């Protein structure tokens, strides 16, 4: 039994195999190639697992799930945080030929119900430490509403659903049965913030290539010691190169519950971390901690800081090598496929001011206008892409696929970009982040980047607010070091030489900005704040 998904046209699949992108290996090869190694694969608090132990634990769990009736071709819904059991579970399911959805630990009932409705899972794996599963009320309701679920395993459970017992039970003559390499290996989550959460089917072939090529570009080796402080289940933390890249190279993943400086700085020093990945808000927190007296000496081992998940302002980018003391690598990717990196030997100008260029020579990327026509080089428009690791359709979502892809299979991500003569991409924002003020278009990220130049501004987010006359006006939400008045903000922006219509109509100074599950500023929540104030 195979999972239905939109396949690449045969001529593309043939080309990707001929060029060596697709090697027809199961994703489990990332782990099993090191199955005899006693090198440390994962450190989780005071626990550590060698590659041999990680592989054996995955075999044990897979064998236990098979005994409970879980079969190849089925699906699973998994919600675990930054714990070693996430990787054990992931590889166990892949060894069984079961395709999981890895829900983020911050997801709640709405997201879990949406995912379960789409994949109809046979298996649920979750954690008693999550508020939803701390008792049995939600669990019982969830299993009753999603009747496909036959097996439940729970981390930190002392009863019949004990995941740890299943992991510890010895595998009895277990033989792995991963799905074929051109079939769905697991589902990634769309980064969209509107409508029903969409699922992205990834195959062994396309995802393994993405990980393998990322390892080459980022030069991960057995000596790589990677701190995973962003959500471990997120695509960025899994594959860019992420934990899977570390495992492929034979290095060590150190898990952290969150990216706070108070937690991460001591871990970096203790475990001699040499690479980690953050989102821009976390970078700001680290820089702020250093400004407020945290010792930079704790970060002496750190050689590479990857920043992705959202656009990094040039102002913040320039501060990383100067204040943290390591190399910056910008990462612009998407769970749907395409990944761009600044290269380790790029000039400072490229690293600070661009988001890099695509991984693969067969990544086809161009810029379109609103009607889907190609734009000249350097102009800002919609990103269009297809390639050997970019998907061809959301799972069970024909209506959305009709608008997300053009007739030639190019995916429109909704990102607004420009491409320079050397092929480097600069992200200018998102279509939905564009504010239409009386017919004048304002790219929110342009104004946010200017606001971040102000010495008193720590974070900035520009959102639209409804206006009867203009249609939309803009509101700047700021987290500041010292009080700022709207007149001061506008004066500063005028000094940057921007048009008057781009000045924020309203300025709100707040203690913090709300974040989505993957660490991006939650602009939907900010707009709701505005709407609630307007109606009060």
From Swiss-Prot:
GO cellular component: membrane
E.C. number(s) listed in UniProt: 6.3.2.14, 6.2.1.71
InterPro entries: AMP-bd_C, AMP-bd_C_sf, AMP-binding_CS, AMP-dep_synth/lig_dom, ANL_N_sf, ATP-dep_AMP-bd_enzyme, DHB_AMP_lig
Keyword Electron transport annotated: no
BP GO annotations: enterobactin biosynthetic process
UniProt keyword list: Acyltransferase, ATP-binding, Enterobactin biosynthesis, Ligase, Membrane, Nucleotide-binding, Transferase
Cellular location(s): Membrane
Catalysed transformations (reactions): 3 2,3-dihydroxybenzoate + 3 L-serine + 6 ATP = enterobactin + 6 AMP + 6 diphosphate + 4 H(+); 2,3-dihydroxybenzoate + holo-[ACP] + ATP = 2,3-dihydroxybenzoyl-[ACP] + AMP + diphosphate; 2,3-dihydroxybenzoyl-5'-AMP + holo-[ACP] = 2,3-dihydroxybenzoyl-[ACP] + AMP + H(+)
CDD domains given in the database record: 23DHB-AMP_lg
Residue span of region Phosphopantetheine binding: 438-439
Alphabetical list of Gene3D superfamilies matching this protein: 3.30.300.30, N-terminal domain of ligase-like
Domain of life the protein comes from: Bacteria
SUPFAM superfamilies assigned to the protein according to its UniProt record, in alphabetical order: Acetyl-CoA synthetase-like (SSF56801)
Entry keyword annotation includes Translocase: no
Entry's family note: Belongs to the ATP-dependent AMP-binding enzyme family. EntE subfamily.
Subunit: Proteins EntB, EntD, EntE, and EntF form a multienzyme complex called enterobactin synthase. Monomer. EntA and EntE interact together.
Function field: Involved in the biosynthesis of the siderophore enterobactin (enterochelin), which is a macrocyclic trimeric lactone of N-(2,3-dihydroxybenzoyl)-serine. The serine trilactone serves as a scaffolding for the three catechol functionalities that provide hexadentate coordination for the tightly ligated iron(2+) atoms. EntE processes via a two-step adenylation-ligation reaction (bi-uni-uni-bi ping-pong mechanism).
Name this protein carries in UniProt: Enterobactin synthase component E
Protein's organism: Escherichia coli O157:H7
């Amino acid at each position: 039994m195979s999972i239905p998904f939109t396949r690449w046209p045969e001529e593309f699949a043939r080309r990707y195999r001929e060029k060596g992108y697709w090697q027809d290996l199961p994703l489990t090869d990332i782990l099993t190639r090191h199955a005899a190694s006693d090198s440390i694969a994962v450190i989780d608090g005071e626990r550590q697992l060698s590659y041999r132990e990680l592989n054996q634990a995955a075999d044990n769990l897979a064998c236990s799930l098979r005994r409970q009736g879980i079969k190849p071709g089925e699906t699973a819904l998994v919600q675990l945080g930054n714990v070693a059991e996430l990787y054990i579970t992931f590889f166990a399911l892949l060894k069984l030929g079961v395709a999981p959805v890895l829900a983020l630990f911050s997801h709640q009932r709405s997201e879990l119900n949406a995912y379960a409705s789409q994949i109809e899972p046979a298996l649920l794996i979750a954690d008693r430490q999550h508020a939803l599963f701390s008792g049995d009320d939600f669990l019982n309701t969830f299993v009753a509403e999603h009747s496909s679920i036959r097996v439940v395993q729970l981390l930190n459970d002392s009863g019949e659903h004990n995941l740890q017992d299943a992991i510890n039970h010895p595998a009895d003559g277990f033989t792995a049965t991963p799905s074929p390499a051109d079939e769905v290996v697991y589902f990634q989550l769309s980064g969209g913030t509107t409508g029903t959460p969409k699922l992205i089917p990834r195959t062994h072939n396309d995802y393994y290539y993405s990980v393998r090529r990322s390892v080459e570009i980022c030069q991960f080796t057995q000596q790589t010691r990677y701190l995973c402080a962003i959500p471990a289940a997120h695509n960025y933390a899994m594959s860019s190169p992420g934990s899977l890249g570390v495992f492929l190279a034979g290095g060590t993943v150190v898990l952290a519950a969150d990216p706070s400086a108070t937690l991460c700085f001591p871990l970096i020093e203790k475990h001699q971390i040499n690479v980690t990945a953050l989102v821009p808000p976390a970078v700001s927190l680290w820089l702020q901690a250093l400004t407020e007296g945290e010792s930079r000496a704790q970060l002496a081992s750190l050689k590479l800081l990857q920043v992705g998940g959202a656009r990094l302002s040039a102002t913040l980018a320039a501060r990383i090598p100067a204040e943290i003391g390591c190399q910056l690598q910008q990462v612009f990717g998407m769970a749907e496929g395409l990944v761009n990196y600044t290269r380790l030997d790029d000039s400072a100008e490229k690293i600070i001011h661009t988001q890099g260029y695509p991984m693969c020579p067969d990544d086809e990327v161009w810029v379109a206008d609103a009607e889907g026509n190609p734009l000249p080089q350097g102009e800002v428009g919609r990103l269009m892409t297809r390639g050997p690791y970019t998907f061809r359709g959301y799972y069970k979502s024909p209506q959305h696929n009709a608008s997300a892809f053009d007739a030639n299979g190019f995916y429109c991500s909704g990102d607004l970009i420009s491409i320079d003569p050397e092929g480097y991409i600069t992200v200018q924002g998102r279509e939905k982040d564009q504010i239409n003020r009386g017919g004048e278009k304002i790219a929110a990220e342009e104004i946010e980047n200017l606001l971040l130049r102000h010495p008193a501004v720590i974070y900035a987010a520009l959102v639209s607010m409804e206006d009867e006359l203009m249609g939309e006006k803009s509101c700047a939400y700021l987290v500041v070091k010292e009080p700022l008045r709207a007149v001061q903000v506008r004066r500063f922006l005028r000094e940057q030489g921007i048009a008057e219509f781009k000045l924020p109509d309203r300025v709100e100074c707040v203690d913090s900005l709300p974040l989505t599950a993957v660490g991006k500023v939650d602009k939907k929540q900010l707009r709701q704040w505005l709407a609630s104030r307007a109606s009060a």
